[in-house]
Amino acid sequence: MAAKLQDLELSSEEVDRFSKAFKDPTFREMFIQYAEEISDPENRKKYEQEIYKMENERGMDIKFIHPKPGYVLLSSVNGVQKCYLNICSNDLIQKPEFKPGKDGEGKAGLHWSLPYSLSPGRDDLSKDWSKHVIYDVVFHPDTLHIASKNGKFKGIVDSTALEAVASQFNVTLDKANVRTLSMKYKGVPNPSVLRKPLPEASPKSRDLEDPLCFPYPYDVPTAVGTEKKDQKRVIQKECKQHLVTPEQDPNVQVAATPNYTVRHRSYVDLQDFRDSRDSTPSPVPKELVITVDLPLLNSAAGVNLHIAGKNLSLESEKPAYKLNVKLPYAVEDNQGKAQFNKVKKQLIITVPVIQHNILSLMQDHFQEARGEKDNQNKAEHSVLNKEHTDNSGITSARGTEKLLELEEENQFEGLASISSMDTGASHLPEILPNLNTFGKEQVVNQMNEDTPNVPTDNLVCPTFTCSQDPTSLTLIVHVRDIDENSICADVGSNHYHIRCYRKQSRAFYDLLVTFLPHDIIISNEVSVNISEDNVVIGLTKCPESFGFWKKLYFGVSGQSLQERRFVIEENINKVLACSIPLSQVSPSIQEHQPLIEVLEMTDEKTHIRLNEPKIEYVDSAEHNEQCTDHSESERDTSLELPNVDGKDSAEQCSSQVSPCKHNIELGREHTSERDKEPKPTSCTAESTSGQQPNDSHLVCPGDNCAQDSNAENKMACLKSSVQTTQESDLDEDDMPDNSDHLQNSASSNNILKEISSKDGSVQVISDHTTHCPFQFQNSLLFELD
């Protein structure tokens, strides 16, 4: 009962009033009398006579058209619900007329004019409480008589009724599934009214004080307007009704496309709202719900449904339905379910969505978009060839961000392997031979042709920073006051080349950035933003190259390129794996080797802390006693570490060291003080070979009478101090190394070139001297900084 009263939209107070009224016997008697009066034919005649008199007083002539049953057509309105068309007859409608004529092919025939009358649609309920709409189309009885004798003429009558209802009430009827029922009339007959103004009648003046005076609910038609409308209708009928279309032919049946809706359904999971990177709700729904409206079906027995990947197809023979839908996501066709709602005449299909990775979905999307753009680029490229333009894709950017695509043929074809992490970063590796020959010469020559006035000998490589994410790469060239008109850029699938100069100093800058062959960029999706401080270049990675890239090569075109590795986990792990064993370093160097602690490592900087150890030596007897004490119980030792970093910070910090069997005291002294007054220190350490040390005293590193056993003890002491600083946080640069040859090479090269950041001028400094308390064993850490 609740479902039946749902569409009434009654409030609780109205329901209470109705329930109380129908419980009253007096109200029930009055209600029965009212129903009998309105259904009595005699009372209806009196009602019509009274209406006729009132309309005459207003100057209107009305006629009540009572439809006589003929036959019923079944269809659907707007693809949602059933629709019944009662084809009726009445003598008040004009008779059909015909005129001989010819069709478009010159065949002789008859042009029929079929007058009709329409009544507004009314809603009704079927036995299963489903809604449907009923329309009455009234013709002259002679029209229905001819239709009963001639099948083609009946098709003209049916198409006329369908077109009249669709055009007059602005609805869409399913003409493909029109079916003639065996019944003669659907619902309760309801008369319609024809109104025409009387030509010589004078309407009665309205008295505003009369309580029965109310405004006329209908527009007062004029005789001229009525004649024009009738003529227009007759012309439309004559133009449309004399031909039998394929849709009207009963032998030809065209399937209708039903209405459908696709809904995305997901479920709330509290794990998607955690404070974590991987806890974001997925934009991909869990399942798709497809609702198909099939108003002419009573069950889903004759429906063929097929789902494969992203395609859904539905077919039905009687009634004829056909639907092909491309779903937005690939679905599990074997795990779906379908259910037919008999009340709403809907087929509800629920299928789960295949949960792909978001990155793979982006790759599919970019591949489809790239395929379309490649076709456009090929067409543009053919036009450029006709105009005798180069296919290098070089263009001058005048404050814009549009760059043409450069075709990179035969470039990076000889890549076989990647060089090891131990190699230096200031040369072009041998694994890129084609870059030195064809590809690089083509880029340089084309760039020189576009900028003929630029001196190639005075080109300077600007400083730049590079950052990346899985789908894009950003280059920031740190050059101020760049002339927008001077920018000349070249982009390819594996390289980007830019050349420009400053406004005031006219200093020319040239930067060529190349990538590995499998690291591909989309050449027609490049953005260039120019500001007073820098130039920001945005590159989009190809979908096949999504992810974090390992390295790139940069430099001035025509010169050797340098290697720059991205700070990613894989590169850092390789650097840390290249550690130098402590046994290969001499004890004298271990004594002066500082302890290096890496605090922060990014693309822009590397923050380290240096700790200079102070070693104290003690007698062998004390050493044995302390070793015995430590064998019984382990002690925690504190390590005082001064903050020595690249920022000259004066903060002091200390860290706790894990328990060990060595008692180590570390301090810090200035180099000048240690050179002037070397002080003897003591240290207690166990021999690495397990033997007891000699009884002789250990002296300071500057003492020439130090024995070999003292050196072994010092190395063991220093090794234990390195082990106490949590080996998991140290890399190969923290370990002691032999830096004598690095110091000699650094001292021999005292000539420096300094480039001014204001005007780009170069200043040569020949008397420059400096002192560094440590040396990098691996130059890669310095290059990353």
UniProtKB/Swiss-Prot annotation:
Residues 681-695 have a biased composition (Polar residues). Pfam families: PIH1, PIH1_CS. The keyword Aminoacyl-tRNA synthetase does not apply. Signal peptide: none annotated. The keyword Magnesium does not apply. Residues 622-638, 662-679 have a biased composition (Basic and acidic residues). One of its GO terms (cellular component) is cytoplasm. InterPro entries: HSP20-like_chaperone, Kintoun, PIH1/Kintoun_subfamily, PIH1_N, PIH1D1/2/3_CS-like. Residues 622-698, 719-749 are annotated as: Disordered. Keywords: Cytoplasm. It is found in: Cytoplasm; Dynein axonemal particle. Residues 728-737 have a biased composition (Acidic residues). Its main location: cytoplasm. It comes from the Eukaryota. Required for cytoplasmic pre-assembly of axonemal dyneins, thereby playing a central role in motility in cilia and flagella. Involved in pre-assembly of dynein arm complexes in the cytoplasm before intraflagellar transport loads them for the ciliary compartment. PANTHER family: PIH1 DOMAIN-CONTAINING PROTEIN 1 (PTHR22997), PROTEIN KINTOUN (PTHR22997:SF3). This is Protein kintoun. It comes from Xenopus tropicalis (Western clawed frog).
